[in-house]
Amino acid sequence: MKKEEWILPYIKQNARLFVLVIFLGAVTIFSAAFLMFTSGFLISKAATRPENILLIYVPIVAVRTFGIARSVSRYVERLVGHHIILKIVSDMRVRLYNMLEPGALMLRSRFRTGDMLGILSEDIEHLQDAFLKTIFPAISALLLYAVSVIALGFFSWPFAILLALYLFVLVVLFPVVSLLVTRAKNAKLKSGRNVLYSRLTDAVMGVSDWMFSGRRHAFIDAYEKEERDWFELERKKQRFTRWRDFAAQCLVAGLILLMLFWTAGQQADGELAKTMIAAFVLVVFPLTEAFLPLSDALGEVPGYQDSIRRMNNVAPQPEASQTESGDQILDLQDVTLAFRDVTFSYDNSSQVLHNFSFTLRQGEKMALLGRSGSGKSTSLALIEGALKPDSGSVTLNGVETALLKDQIADAVAVLNQKPHLFDTSILNNIRLGNGEASDEDVRRAAKQVKLHDYIESLPDGYHTSVQETGIRFSGGERQRIALARILLQDTPIIILDEPTVGLDPITERELMETVFEVLKGKTILWITHHLAGVEAADKIVFLENGKTEMEGTHEELLAANERYRRLYHLDVPVK
């Protein structure tokens, strides 16, 4: 399935059900039309005071039949239509997730949280309206348009042609004009809604910052102003919509008068019975009800196109998903991680890494230092295979990481700033590192990270729920649970991605001592932005502006590099 196609493939996959929905929609409209037609005939016939009820028994039965048929077909149409749409939306969500997953590690660098939430919720939901409010009604209305003109042709071809031209204004001209007028308005509304979504999401996630800075009123005022501007655009669009609908209703009124004039003429010429005048006039109402929504339906097309564009944009960048044919088998014995003249940039922007190189052999510990934005997180994404360098190579035992796919998880484990803990037991959270681990294996890992005694002191022990995101535990305890998970995973390479951020100095020191103690013999890449504890590393690489600024052991740099010495003493003051 091509990534650009979010409508046609699903129509092809569900073609029979789509035909059924359109058929049921047509049956509903025609039942409503015949209901009004027979009702008009019945009223007129009853007004002639027939001598016997049997003379109007057939139209009475027809009214009842078409009334029931209209209700039943409408119900079944909605039932089948929503069944299809819910299935399609479900498939779309899975497809969108599969597009997101290969580049999941870099989503935060490509999208703001609010934008991503808008894509995952609003854009997917918006596309279901493409079927329910545009495709189904449009096809049913066009089918009705053709059948109505042909049916009227059996009575009078000149009037049928006149009616076709008249309805053409309602079926084609009005929707096209509506599309042209509302395209720009819809684009601004969609863009404004996405901005509001993003702003509000960011504000909710950073509400403490707004509160502590004392600028919450400034944010609220600015947000409310943007919201008022958005509602003003919405009012302008609604104003146009009301005038357009009023004009359409005037056209319908003209059509009713036209039908009344024609039927009166036909009756005067003896071509039509008096009892048929009301029937022909009343049938106009349900028919035009099917045509009126077309303007709104076509006016929403630009919104659907924008949703499709935004959903296609979540596809991973070529470097994030590019793989070559043929599976690469990684030897997990004595794994060596190597960066060789790696250069990388995002979307042809300035280079994040430039000719960056280092080699980390089995059992070595390396600290990768650098300020925010220096390329540390990009280096991590390259190691995990989420990105591919523009030039140079990132390899594990000579195999490029971008080709290893799921094998990366067998070679590399990451202890990051905020390890995710699921709302289940401690036992299950630790066992995520190895689904085949026994309860005893989990307890052994917990003992190694010095968490066993604390867990046993809890009322439910290892079956204690950590609650959503692990809020039951402190930052240091969450990191120890994640570390126990890594021990069960038992990978040769461990990446520490600033795991002590947000911890107090004592907890930080104790955690790092535990980390280096339990990971003895493992290859460790410690990504950090400050120098406390780096003396435990076998070598240090200082990354700045994508290039290696300093490299060596702690002792070598402390003795020979004045800048390193100054930075170290800032983080670790001389006693």
Curated annotation (Swiss-Prot):
Q: Which GO terms describe its cellular component?
A: plasma membrane
What enzyme class is recorded for this protein?
translocase
Q: Where are the transmembrane segments?
A: 17-37, 53-73, 135-155, 161-181, 246-266, 275-295
Give its E.C. classification number.
7.4.2.-
Instruction: Name the keywords, alphabetized.
Output: Amino-acid transport, ATP-binding, Cell membrane, Membrane, Nucleotide-binding, Translocase, Transmembrane, Transmembrane helix, Transport
What does it catalyze? L-cysteine(in) + ATP + H2O = L-cysteine(out) + ADP + phosphate + H(+); glutathione(in) + ATP + H2O = glutathione(out) + ADP + phosphate + H(+)
Indicate the quaternary assembly.
Forms a heterodimer with CydC.
- What's the name of the protein? Glutathione/L-cysteine transport system ATP-binding/permease protein CydD
